[in-house]
Amino acid sequence: MNPNQKIITIGSICMGIGIISLILQIGNIISMWVSHSIQTENQNHHEACNPSIAGQDAASVALAGNSSLCPISGWAIYSKDNGIRIGSKGDVFVIREPFISCSHLECRTFFLTQGALLNDKHSNGTVKDRSPYRTLMSCPVGEAPSPYNSRFVSVAWSASACHDGMGWLTIGISGPDNGAVAVLKYNGIITDTIKSWKNNILRTQESECACINGSCFTIMTDGPSNGQASYKIFKIEKGKVVKSSELNAPNYHYEECSCYPDAGEVMCVCRDNWHGSNRPWVSFNKNLDYQIGYICSGVFGDNPRPNDGTGSCGPVSSNGAYGIKGFSFKYGNGVWIGRTKSTSSRSGFEMIWDPNGWTETDSSFSVKQDIVAITDWSGYSGSFVQHPELTGLDCMRPCFWVELIRGRPNHNTIWTSGSSISFCGVNSDTVGWSWPDGAELPFTIDK
């Protein structure tokens, strides 16, 4: 074979290989296109079916709220966020009024920020309760509230939130003292508003609302903090107010109620800032038929308060002025009472079981569990529950949180903030101890 023939032969072979390669590439492209078309068709078919499936799933996890409280013998620690300790060096919000609420999937800590971070100049003067900079935000329970793990919820200086099994209802009150408005959101979208009806600091729970079979319930107060005010229960469905009822409660004072569902009804234990050192309560059903009273026990739950003694099923006037947000859990004629250890300052915390304290006025009790030592600061406290849809139990698990306030007015700082701890009721071994905030003050910004 002469050189020219060799060249032609080699070229022909190369061209043949190239054509075969091209054909294979074209086949590969066609195969990929066909495969993608099949996948897209399947995906579209799946998405077309998915909404009904998702709707069924959502409906199946609606929180029924008809279970009774779980029987318990004590309280197991559930969370501690150490927000102030972490905030001395990290980016942590200046907050107050934290509370916890759970869906069927998770528990979250809600809190009212001051639009500022700890150890920053904007934390100056944050002892003030109501300002246009305050917002309701939330983060996973047990985490320090920071810009990196928190969700904005609402502009608010008073708030509540709860999950009905299908979405979050949030209530944020903001505006001037003489005309504030509560903005209701459902899954983040504004659904309704409630205007102050007495033009005197409309305010709500500072803890979770209560949901029963798709309806959620909250209590609001409007009027004097040291005299007769007006109190309303609101029934809310998918963020819309469907019914309300004003309490006929002369000589009663309800503020900052801690509410929970129990056997298909709602029980709220509140703060009397007017003239009671024991706590007022209101219970109601889904039709807003209600009953009212005061916890009768001589183990008093408010702060300030007198030493334990003889209680009353009406307001106990001794040391009855002012008060602090708190809670109790009713078990028949018995009651678990959460309270500060100090009778005069917001320090220490303990849980007490009075087996007949809901209806009887003596001061005997059978269980006391230490939560925070009297030498450490505490603050507000409130209840929350974990529904059977979350826990897998056949009962409603009672839980509570305690705010650990630091800064002004008890420390030489320019700021006021807090961290939080929480506990849940169990019918197994528990321990009493002290779980304080633990931050060393003052911070760099204070010096």
Curated annotation (Swiss-Prot):
Protein name: Neuraminidase
Catalytic reaction annotation: Hydrolysis of alpha-(2->3)-, alpha-(2->6)-, alpha-(2->8)- glycosidic linkages of terminal sialic acid residues in oligosaccharides, glycoproteins, glycolipids, colominic acid and synthetic substrates
Remaining remarks: The influenza A genome consist of 8 RNA segments. Genetic variation of hemagglutinin and/or neuraminidase genes results in the emergence of new influenza strains. The mechanism of variation can be the result of point mutations or the result of genetic reassortment between segments of two different strains.
Transmembrane feature ranges: 7-27
Free-text comment about domains: Intact N-terminus is essential for virion morphogenesis. Possesses two apical sorting signals, one in the ectodomain, which is likely to be a glycan, and the other in the transmembrane domain. The transmembrane domain also plays a role in lipid raft association.
Subunit architecture: Homotetramer.
InterPro entries (alphabetical): Glyco_hydro_34, Sialidase_Influenza_A/B, Sialidase_sf
Organism: Influenza A virus (strain A/Fowl plague virus/Rostock/8/1934 H7N1)
Virion surface side: 28-447
Residue positions with a glycan: 66, 124, 213
Function: Catalyzes the removal of terminal sialic acid residues from viral and cellular glycoconjugates. Cleaves off the terminal sialic acids on the glycosylated HA during virus budding to facilitate virus release. Additionally helps virus spread through the circulation by further removing sialic acids from the cell surface. These cleavages prevent self-aggregation and ensure the efficient spread of the progeny virus from cell to cell. Otherwise, infection would be limited to one round of replication.
Keywords: Calcium, Disulfide bond, Glycoprotein, Glycosidase, Host cell membrane, Host membrane, Hydrolase, Membrane, Metal-binding, Signal-anchor, Transmembrane, Transmembrane helix, Virion
Disulfide bonds: 70-395, 102-107, 162-209, 211-216, 257-270, 259-268, 296-313, 399-424
Membrane-protein topology: Single-pass type II membrane protein
Activity regulation info: Inhibited by the neuraminidase inhibitors zanamivir (Relenza) and oseltamivir (Tamiflu). These drugs interfere with the release of progeny virus from infected cells and are effective against all influenza strains. Resistance to neuraminidase inhibitors is quite rare.
Localization terms from the record: Virion membrane; Host apical cell membrane
